[in-house]
Amino acid sequence: LRGQLLLEPSENLDINLSIDYSNRDENCCSSVTIVRGPTAAIIDALAPDSGVAPVADPYARRAWSNRSSAQYIEDNGGSLQIDWNSPWFGGATLTSITALREWSSTNGIDFDYSTADILYRNPEKGDNFTGFETFSQEIRMAGATDNVDWLVGLF
């Protein structure tokens, strides 16, 4: 979901508000066995039925997960850009861009990566295991003369 709103309160001022939101339910990820260590026989004994730890062959692209690998991802953000054609320096444009973004992921992981059900993290919506928030601010002024186009700013 995305939206933008452009306001032009005067011929010298533009204000652009942009927001977005997305969420997805996915299934991701497992790993392949690269090395079968000395505990493989113990893991096999703990596995239900006649489970056997996967063979150490990363090129076979075989992975094992005996629990859900559900993943819930939420991503949203917005920005506000203000452009003002100033009376300074021959009509230079002063621009301010303020932005905020949040991202979070909750995922189920079969941590033992084997046929045994030893270690697992259950994906509960609302439990934020991974995420970030970012804020940014940019201010710049751009203009031109007969011989030079110029730009100065801070981020």
Residue ranges and their predicted role:
Residues L1-C29, G37, N76-L80, G131-Q137, ...:
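Transmembrane beta-barrel wall of Gram-negative outer-membrane proteins
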Residues S65-N66, Q71-G77:
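Outer-membrane beta-barrel signature, preferentially recognizing the C-terminal barrel domain
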